[in-house]
Regions:
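Extended alpha-helical interaction scaffolds
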Residues: 1-431
């Protein structure tokens, strides 16, 4: 950045001056007599003057079509009526902004604790606060875009990449530090609460549903609070999906597994808190099957009794009655009386029952859920959700893990951040 913004030694300035000189080859300015004759012809001819006179482009040259965007940036193509994307874009303004960034980074480097000051600088961007570096990045991207598609590669190399490289120098250690903070404050507690518990694992131990809500609830959940507090500047929501900010996240490499995980939990939150309170509403319809004369399904105190009558929808809510948690299914065949298919105790009993069946999607909101009884009879229900996959979304948590890295960073940056965090912890202990 020092070399690029040096008015005497800058290779960028030298290159742009050369391009401007070459681009103006063969240009001819319109003389005073030509201008008077043209105005007279317009008056005599009575032609309406266009809103944008495409012929009034200042000096004309054979290379204008190719070098026009660069000449406009350098102020070498300034006809009075020429159409310009933005008169405020100029190479001099860009270099002034680069100098401001360089001075800011030099200030960080000469601080008593450069690592801490650099993390503070990066954190302002993570939290959505504007700084000189990101403003200049955006200005460079705007200049690159204003040059047009033919010059896009040149514009990116000259005006975007130098600042991106400088930004990466700031971001890498800070991203590693944020990874460590995410791992300690969120992931560690998540694993303590849910590892080895149903529905995350095939286990007899149940995960706490209120604790799951504590993590995934929209806006007030632990995950949303962390993301909106620490990453508001580089990550935002579009609908229910978390999406990286295309401008401020330049130089950052988000861990794809992290984005998939938080978006899966965000969708689950929408399903689990559709009406604001914790719970999932859905409908069930029993289906007639051969050799079965009656089924009785109980879900948290809510009963669906079917004895081969005309099938009808019945509404359910899970969790239902908290004093009667669990699911129980009995069936009666033509050859025997009522028998117990399964009794699933606890809050997650209904989800455990669903986990035992086979699921076939019929359309966007309906699934056929089938169970094979010990006598090889098939017991079937159609499940209709109100949003997304309904209660079946909870089965997708099997094998789910919350990644401990938000960003993909190199090992050196990770080691540097961990060492800095260790020093901070040691100082806190001394105090």
């Amino acid at each position: 950045l020092t070399l690029m913004s040096d008015i005497r030694q800058s290779p960028l300035i030298a290159l742009m001056n050369t391009l401007a000189w070459q681009g103006q080859t063969g240009q001819q300015s319109e003389g005073l007599s030509d201008s008077i004759i043209k105005s007279a012809k317009d008056l005599v001819g009575g032609k309406d003057k266009p809103a944008i006179d495409q012929s009034a482009t200042g000096p004309q040259g054979p290379l204008d079509e190719t070098f026009g965007p660069l000449l406009q940036l350098l102020g070498k193509n300034t006809g009075s009526n020429v159409m310009s994307a933005d008169n405020s874009l100029s190479l001099q303004t860009y270099l002034t902004r680069v100098t401001r960034v360089r001075l800011r980074l030099q200030q960080v480097a000469s601080a008593s604790d450069p690592q801490e000051m650099m993390q503070t600088l990066a954190q302002t961007v993570f939290q959505g606060k504007s700084v000189d570096l990101t403003d200049t990045q955006q200005y460079g991207s705007l200049i690159s875009a204003s040059l047009g598609e033919e010059w896009s590669g040149f514009g990116s190399t000259m005006f975007v990449q130098p600042l991106t490289q400088a930004w990466e120098t700031v971001l890498q250690p800070s991203a590693a530090s944020l990874n460590d903070k995410w791992s300690r404050s969120v992931v560690a507690n998540w694993r303590t609460a849910f590892d080895g518990r149903f529905p995350f694992a095939a286990s007899k131990s149940d995960a706490s549903l209120p604790m799951l809500a504590e993590f995934i609830r929209k806006d007030s959940g632990r995950i949303d609070r962390f993301l909106t507090t620490e990453l508001n500047g580089v990550l935002h929501k579009e609908g229910s999906q978390w999406v990286p900010d295309k401008v401020n996240s330049q130089g950052l490499s988000f861990n794809p597994a992290f984005l998939r995980a938080i978006n899966q939990l965000s969708e689950l939150s929408d399903i689990l808190f559709t009406d604001g309170s914790q719970g999932i509403s859905f409908d069930l319809q029993a289906r007639p099957v051969p050799r079965v004369v009656e089924t009785q399904l109980t879900i948290d105190g809510q009963k669906l009794h079917y004895f081969n009558q005309m099938a009808d929808w019945q509404s359910f809510r899970w969790p239902g009655d908290t004093y009667k948690p669990g699911a129980m299914l009995t069936w009666t065949s033509v050859n025997a009386g009522a028998r117990l298919f399964g009794d699933y105790r606890g809050t997650w009993g209904f989800i455990r029952w669903l986990d035992q069946g086979k699921r076939q999607q019929l359309d966007r909101s309906q699934w056929m859920v089938s169970f094979t009884a010990p006598d090889d009879s098939t017991l079937q229900w159609v499940l209709r959700s109100q949003l997304g996959n309904g209660p079946l979304a909870l089965l997708a948590l099997r094998g789910f893990t919350l990644p401990d890295q938000i960003f993909s960073v190199d090992s050196a940056a990770t080691a540097q951040a961990l060492m800095a965090n260790t020093e901070i912890s040691d100082m806190d202990g001394i105090e």
